[in-house]
């Protein structure tokens, strides 16, 4: 199905080689499914119904915030849909899990509480549903990892490509800039920034991207150095092509192989990196759902709450394992020895 949209013969060969790696294909499918599930989390786990018909009117609480007065409730500032008195002809459609990632289960005796039919993966030390926080937390992990990868790749390819194409003084000064950035203690800088500014996903992405492009620049520089004097580039120069056209039209598409190869591994490193920061308390602001924060709770409650270690660890291992399988498939597909 996809093959009919691929016009480039080399790209088609690479795609067919990737398809031969069944483990990589299955891992890709599972990752796509996991992306859909986490970004559709409000439809799967929510303390508000997806649809409600009440007193002859239709409501969509999961998508629209309603005032208690809309339901004739005068003695509350919020609507507790679980305890709301409904008419006999009312219809309520709930998500699969009736918890949001921030609310506590007040019906259990103590926190953290073990897995039950109400809380599949148990609750954390504040009574919040672990399954829901894992589902929502994955969205932040993926968003962080992909954003850092995109920004770092763009900056690294741009600067590395310019160093490789022009060489000479541009390459010399560019290399010195890379060396300066490599000497910066990123973790200490991150701690300083968090102590000054309010921790957020944007801040973490910004700092990680500013100091995460150097590795990409090395690969881009090497590829541009190798490709800038090849015959097809010389032919483009002879036909009067501009520098920008030569860089972006001819050299860049033929220099992306190593960069694309490392993309799944880079994203996996981003997921584990954010989990590590959250585990140490330097990541997303509390009470944002986070895998690392759940693992930190597991460390504190290891002897009494095995589920806090088991389920977050399994989620982290599974996601990283799937990205590694995809990365292996991409690496084999783009391997020049397989051309």
Describe each model-derived feature in a short phrase:
Residues 1-153, 157, 161-162, 301-313, ...:
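Gly/Trp-centered helix-boundary motif
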Residues 123-339:
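Alpha-helical transmembrane segments of integral membrane proteins
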């Amino acid at each position: 199905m996809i093959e009919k949209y691929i016009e480039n013969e080399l790209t088609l060969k690479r795609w067919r080689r990737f398809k031969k790696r069944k483990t990589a294909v299955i891992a890709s499918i599972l990752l796509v499914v996991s992306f859909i599930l986490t970004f559709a989390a409000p439809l799967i786990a929510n303390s508000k119904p997806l649809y409600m018909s009440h007193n002859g009117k239709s409501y969509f609480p999961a998508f629209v915030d309603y005032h208690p007065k809309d339901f004739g409730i005068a003695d509350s500032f919020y609507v507790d849909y679980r305890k709301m008195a409904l008419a006999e002809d009312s219809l309520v459609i709930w998500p699969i899990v009736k918890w949001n990632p921030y609310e506590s289960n007040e019906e259990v005796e103590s926190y953290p509480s073990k897995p039950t039919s109400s809380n599949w993966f148990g609750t954390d030390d504040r009574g919040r549903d672990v399954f829901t926080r894992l589902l929502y937390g994955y969205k932040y992990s993926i968003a962080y990892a992909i954003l850092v990868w995109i920004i770092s790749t763009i900056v690294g390819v741009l600067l590395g490509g310019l160093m490789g194409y022009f060489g000479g003084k541009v390459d010399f000064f560019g290399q010195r800039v890379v060396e300066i950035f490599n000497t910066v203690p990123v973790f200490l800088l991150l701690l300083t920034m968090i102590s000054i500014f309010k921790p957020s996903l944007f801040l973490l992405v910004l700092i990680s991207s500013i100091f995460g492009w150097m590795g990409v620049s090395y690969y881009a520089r090497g590829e541009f150095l190798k490709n800038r004097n090849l015959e097809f580039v010389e032919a483009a120069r002879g036909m009067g092509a501009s520098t920008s056209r030569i860089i972006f039209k001819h050299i860049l598409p033929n220099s992306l192989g190593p960069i694309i190869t490392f993309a799944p591994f880079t994203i996996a490193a981003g997921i584990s990196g954010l989990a590590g920061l959250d585990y140490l308390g330097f990541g997303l602001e509390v009470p944002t759902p986070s895998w690392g924060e759940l693992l930190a709770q597991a460390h504190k409650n290891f002897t009494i709450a095995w589920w806090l270690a088991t389920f977050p660890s399994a989620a982290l291992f599974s996601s990283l394992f799937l990205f590694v399988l995809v990365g292996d498939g991409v690496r084999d597909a783009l391997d020049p020895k397989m051309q």
